[in-house]
C-alpha cells in the first residue's frame, strides 16, 4: 500500500466519521452485494448454438470491434480477464444459447449436462450462475411470437424450452450453493395496430403457468419475468407489458425483472423499486443505459445508476434485490465494456453505502427539505474515491484507470489474433 493511498484512506475515514458513517462497515456491506455480469457482452449475443446466425427479437448489437469470443473457451478466458479487474463478489448470467455440445441440441431438449463446463468453471472462479431461456434468434420465433404464439405446437416448443431452462437453473443452484435467478423475457409483439390485444396475453398467462408448474427448491432456483415497452419490429404492441408482468409476478409471487431500458425514455426503474417491493417477493434488476431507446449502452456512473443503488441501500433490500447488468456494445473492447460497467455499478453501491441516510431521513421527516437538499449535494463531494481505492487494494485489483493497461495487453496478446 502506498503512503499516498494510506493517507487518503485515513482522511476519508475521518471525513465520513464526521457525518456518522463507518467506512469499514460500508465495505463489509459492499462485499455482500454481488453483481451478475452478463456473458453476452463478450460475443454480441451470438451464443454457440448458431454463432453465424442473425440476432433477432427486436434487439441490436451495433459495432464491429475486433476480437469477439468465438467459442466457450475464448469467452471464459475473456471473462476471467474482466473478473480480475473488478473488485468484490460477482456472478455470471448465462443465456441458453451458450450451451456446449458436440452435436446440435434443440432448445426444448437442453439439459444440465450441456452446461457442466460452465458449472465447473464457476466453481473454480467462486461465482454463482444465473440463467435465461433464449426465446429469440430461432426459426420458431421468426414471426415475432413465442410463448404467446397462436400455433399450439410452436407455443408448446417454447413452453418446453422454458421448462428445460428451469431445470438447468435449478442445477446451477444445487451445484453452486447459491440460487440461480432465471429470467424469462420474450420478444412477442406486433409492428402495427393490433386488434386483439387480449388473446395473446391470455395465451402467455396460461403458458407461463405451465412453465412454472414444476416446483424447485427456492434455495436453488428463483423465477423472474421481464416486461418491455417495445422492440424493433414490435413498436405497436408488446404482449409482455409492464402491467402484464407486474400482475403476473404479484399473483404468482415470482420475482419481477426491471430493465433500465425497457420503459419509456422518461421513466426510470429507480422509482419503480419501492413500489414493486410492496407486492412481489424479489426484484431482479437489469442495469443498462438506454440512449433514446433500449440501446443497451455500457453502464455509466450516472444519476440513474446511482439512484438504483441508493434505493437498494436506503431500504435495506440486500436480500430481496438481485443486481444484474444487461448491455452489449460491439463498438469498443468487449472486456473493457464489462469492466467499465461492472465497476461503475459497484461504485454506485459504495457511494450509496457511504450516504448518511439516517440523518437525511430525519430531516425529511421533520420537513427540513432545505437541509435535506444541502446535505445530499454536499455528500457528493466527500472523498468516496479514496474508499473505493482501498476496496480495490484489498481485493487485489487496480484502483484507478491502471486496469486499462491490462486490457490493452490482453488485446494485443490475445484478442488481436482472433479473425
From Swiss-Prot:
A GO cellular-component term linked to this record: cytoplasm
MF annotations from Gene Ontology: L-rhamnose isomerase activity; manganese ion binding
Gene3D superfamilies given in the database record: Divalent-metal-dependent TIM barrel enzymes (3.20.20.150)
Reactions accelerated catalytically: L-rhamnopyranose = L-rhamnulose
EC number(s) recorded for this UniProt protein: 5.3.1.14
Regions that span the bilayer: none
Keyword Phosphoprotein appears in the UniProt entry: no
Keywords: Cytoplasm, Isomerase, Manganese, Metal-binding, Rhamnose metabolism
SUPFAM superfamilies with a match to the protein in the record: Xylose isomerase-like
Binding site for Mn(2+): 262, 294, 296
Cofactor: Mn(2+)
Entries under InterPro entries matching the protein: L-rhamnose_isomerase (IPR050337), Rhamnose_isomerase (IPR009308), Xyl_isomerase-like_sf (IPR036237)
Pfam families cross-referenced by the UniProt entry: RhaA
Superkingdom of this protein's organism: Bacteria
Pathway membership, UniProt: Carbohydrate degradation; L-rhamnose degradation; glycerone phosphate from L-rhamnose: step 1/3
A GO BP entry: rhamnose catabolic process
Intracellular or extracellular location(s): Cytoplasm
Cofactor, free-text remark: Binds 1 Mn(2+) ion per subunit.
Role played: Catalyzes the interconversion of L-rhamnose and L-rhamnulose.
Entries under HAMAP family matching the protein: RhaA
Subunit and partners: Homotetramer.
Family: Belongs to the rhamnose isomerase family.
Name of the protein in its database record: L-rhamnose isomerase
Amino acid at each position: 500500500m502506498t503512503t499516498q493511498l494510506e493517507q487518503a484512506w485515513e482522511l476519508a475515514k475521518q471525513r465520513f466519521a464526521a457525518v456518522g458513517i463507518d467506512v469499514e462497515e460500508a465495505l463489509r456491506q459492499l462485499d455482500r452485494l454481488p453483481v451478475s455480469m452478463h456473458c453476452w457482452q463478450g460475443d454480441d449475443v451470438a451464443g454457440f448454438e448458431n454463432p453465424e446466425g442473425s440476432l433477432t427479437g427486436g434487439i441490436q448489437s451495433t459495432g464491429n470491434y475486433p476480437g469477439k469470443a468465438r467459442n466457450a473457451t475464448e469467452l471464459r478466458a475473456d471473462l476471467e480477464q474482466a473478473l480480475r479487474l473488478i473488485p468484490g463478489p460477482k456472478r455470471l448470467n448465462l443465456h441458453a444459447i451458450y450451451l456446449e455440445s458436440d452435436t446440435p441440441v434443440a432448445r426444448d431438449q437442453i439439459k444440465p449436462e450441456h452446461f457442466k463446463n460452465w458449472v465447473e468453471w464457476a466453481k473454480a472462479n467462486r461465482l454463482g450462475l444465473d440463467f435465461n431461456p433464449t426465446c429469440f434468434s430461432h426459426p420458431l420465433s421468426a414471426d415475432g411470437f413465442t410463448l404467446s404464439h397462436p400455433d399450439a405446437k410452436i407455443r408448446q416448443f417454447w413452453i418446453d424450452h422454458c421448462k428445460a431452462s428451469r431445470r438447468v437453473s435449478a442445477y446451477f443452484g444445487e451445484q453452486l450453493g447459491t440460487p440461480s435467478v432465471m429470467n424469462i423475457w420474450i420478444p412477442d409483439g406486433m409492428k402495427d395496430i393490433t386488434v386483439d390485444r387480449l388473446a395473446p396475453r391470455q395465451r402467455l398467462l396460461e403458458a407461463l403457468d405451465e412453465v412454472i408448474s414444476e416446483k424447485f427448491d427456492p434455495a436453488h432456483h428463483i423465477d423472474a419475468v421481464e416486461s418491455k415497452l417495445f422492440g424493433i419490429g414490435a413498436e405497436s404492441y408488446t404482449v409482455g407489458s409492464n402491467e402484464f408482468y407486474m400482475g403476473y409476478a404479484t399473483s404468482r409471487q415470482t420475482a419481477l425483472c426491471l430493465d433500465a431500458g425497457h420503459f419509456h425514455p422518461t421513466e426510470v426503474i429507480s422509482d419503480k423499486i419501492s413500489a414493486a417491493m410492496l407486492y412481489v417477493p424479489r426484484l431482479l434488476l437489469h442495469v443498462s443505459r438506454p440512449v433514446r431507446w433500449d440501446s443497451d449502452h455500457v453502464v455509466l456512473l450516472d444519476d440513474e445508476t446511482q439512484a438504483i443503488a441508493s434505493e437498494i441501500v436506503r431500504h435495506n433490500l440486500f436480500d430481496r434485490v438481485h443486481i444484474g447488468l444487461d448491455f452489449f456494445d460491439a463498438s469498443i473492447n468487449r472486456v473493457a465494456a464489462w469492466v467499465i460497467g461492472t465497476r461503475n455499478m459497484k461504485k454506485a453501491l459504495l457511494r450509496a453505502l457511504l450516504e448518511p441516510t439516517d440523518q437525511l431521513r430525519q430531516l425529511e421527516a421533520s420537513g427540513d427539505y432545505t437541509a435535506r437538499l444541502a446535505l445530499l449535494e454536499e455528500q457528493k463531494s466527500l472523498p468516496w474515491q479514496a474508499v473505493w481505492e482501498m476496496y480495490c487494494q484489498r481485493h487485489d485489483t487496480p484502483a484507478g484507470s491502471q486496469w486499462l493497461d491490462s486490457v490493452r495487453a490482453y488485446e494485443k496478446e490475445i484478442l488481436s489474433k482472433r479473425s
